[in-house]
Amino acid sequence: MELLFLGTGAGVPAKERNVSSVALQLLGERGATWLFDCGEATQHQILHTAIRPRRIEHIFITHLHGDHLFGLPGLLGSRSFQSGETPLTVFGPKGIRSFVETALAVSGTKLRYELNIVEIDEGVIFDDERFSVIAKRLDHGMPSYGFRVVEKDLPGPLLVERLQALGVRPGPIYQEIKQGKTVVLDDGTVIDGREFVGPPQKGRIVAVLGDTRFCEAAIELARDADVVVHEATFAAAEQRLAHDYFHSTTTDAAEVARRAGAKRLILTHISSRYQGEAALQLVAEARSVFPNTELAVDFASFSIPRG
């Protein structure tokens, strides 16, 4: 599991930062990539990475401002020409269906794969045997959502050495034991599978938040997260400006991570006014509140290990 940032700027494309998009790479977990937001030229950014559009399974749109959305029709269309045949689901606020369907219809774009569009509200918006995704509305003056991706706990490892000490040889019986079943050996020995399986492996939590002021919903989404991706459009000194434009400062983001008990914070959605030393100062401001903070740049990747 890793995060790969495709666009980390705010508002409009800039020379050093494209507009918003981040990929959650789940290649080992499910052979898929999930995108969060799809600003203009996201598919151009993808060309400079190892991401394969045909592996994009879900796209989550935080809100309908253009810098988070305008790259979506092009990416959906291009996926058809890049061997994309598996279904893809777009999740987003009310209006996302009209936007996508109109763009595809007016441009005469025909998709070779099944496209599902889900207009979301708060709550669980996706759930399967491995992951769930929870959405909550943030404070941005228009419907803007944050997403909490929860990896479900994995079964503990089979304690092979203990089984071998009892003379239990590898075979189909190992699978039964790993499932916690009670099995009877050829010599009549009864084995309780639960005693030969280690503790469950704790699933990881990733919170990806859309544009927002500081708010309690952001804290709830980030609670105990392994990684929080939070906008930091403005420096701490621009608190009034951030509030007026429904955005966050560096210290707003850091305070969310601190109150949530998160492990790690990654800042994104950075105004183009902050370059070079000014950008480094943003990190310093956030670290004064939440030390384990990093600043995303385009094409930066962050591994998310277990534990």
From Swiss-Prot:
GO molecular function: 3'-tRNA processing endoribonuclease activity; zinc ion binding
Binding residues annotated for Zn(2+) 2, in chain numbering: D67, H68, D211, H269
Active site per UniProt: D67
Swiss-Prot/TrEMBL keywords: Endonuclease, Hydrolase, Metal-binding, Nuclease, tRNA processing, Zinc
Residues that, per the record, bind Zn(2+) 1: H63, H65, H140, D211
Catalytic activity: Endonucleolytic cleavage of RNA, removing extra 3' nucleotides from tRNA precursor, generating 3' termini of tRNAs. A 3'-hydroxy group is left at the tRNA terminus and a 5'-phosphoryl group is left at the trailer molecule
InterPro entries: Metallo-B-lactamas (IPR001279), RibonucZ/Hydroxyglut_hydro (IPR036866), RNase_Z/BN (IPR013471)
SUPFAM superfamilies documented for this protein: Metallo-hydrolase/oxidoreductase (SSF56281)
Cysteine pairs bridged by disulfides in the record: none
Signal sequence residues: none
Enzyme nomenclature, EC number: 3.1.26.11
Cofactor binding description: Binds 2 Zn(2+) ions.
Flavoprotein found in the keyword field: no
Pfam families xref list: Lactamase_B, Lactamase_B_2
Cofactor(s) this protein requires: Zn(2+)
Keyword Metal-binding belongs to the record: yes
Catalytic EC class: hydrolase
Subunit field text: Homodimer.
Family membership: Belongs to the RNase Z family.
Purpose of the protein: Zinc phosphodiesterase, which displays some tRNA 3'-processing endonuclease activity. Probably involved in tRNA maturation, by removing a 3'-trailer from precursor tRNA.
The protein, known as: Ribonuclease Z
Lineage: Bacteria, Bacillati, Bacillota, Bacilli, Bacillales
